[in-house]
Amino acid sequence: MIIAQNKTNYQDLLKTLAVIAMTIDHIGLYLYPELTIMRIIGRIAMPVFCFFAGYNFYDKPKTRIIIYGVILQIYTTILFKQFLTTNILISIYLGQCYIYYFRNSITSFFYNGFCHVAVMIILWYISWTLIDYGTLVIAIMILGFIAQHEKTNLKLCCFIAIFTSIVHSTFFTLLIPLSDFNFSNTDLILNLTFLTITYILMILSDYSQKILINIKWISRNVIYIYCIQIIILQFIFIYKYTYGFKNW
């Protein structure tokens, strides 16, 4: 099923909420790192975006995603004068490539798709330092792709996507204390609460259900919103917290 192009729907609402969460997360990361609540709210963005990146994938990998991802990565590398973990656009493009080449295997039998998910979750451990969220992005995209082709498994796919996101945050907190997700026990409870609400919202209504508020201009321009806010916030971060551009 391809979502109607000219009508705002429930999927647009979910993605708009994810955009808001993403914006709060990025502001917290670059400007207010002491406010962990902003990072906690931001944890709902990745599973929603990646799930729908897989759910809506039906053709070939989108070249514009990797182009914007590479340009943004070059900008970040020049700005920080070092190579950092690649941005999530590159992760999503790799996910599209993976689904494209393994699409028949993923959808040929119910358990095949979940085997692919399991492999990607396992590979996360050796990939998270290279690409944003590691292969967890690909795993959640596969879940979205399965949900599109196996509607009866949508709730299960959403549950696994949210559950792995909870485990991801908890793992970083417990085992990698210097990570961006160094949450307290209270923070982890809040994280669990927000992600549980996200799961409920993801299974609450049909994604194609029409809504009255026109928010397509937000939900269908996520790539541009992401790139613009990263460019601006990283620039402010460098200018505010380092020597700025005096030594360039």
Swiss-Prot record:
Which Pfam families does UniProt cross-reference here?
A: TraX
Q: Which cysteines are joined by disulfide bonds?
A: none
What is the protein's given name?
Uncharacterized protein RP591
Q: Which organism is it from?
A: Rickettsia prowazekii (strain Madrid E)
Matching InterPro entries, A to Z? TraX
Locate the transmembrane regions by residue number: 65-85, 105-125, 126-146, 156-176, 188-208, 222-242
Subcellular localization, as worded in the UniProt entry: Cell membrane
Alphabetically ordered keywords of this record: Cell membrane, Membrane, Transmembrane, Transmembrane helix
Q: How does it sit in the membrane?
A: Multi-pass membrane protein
Identify the GO cellular component terms for this protein. Answer: plasma membrane
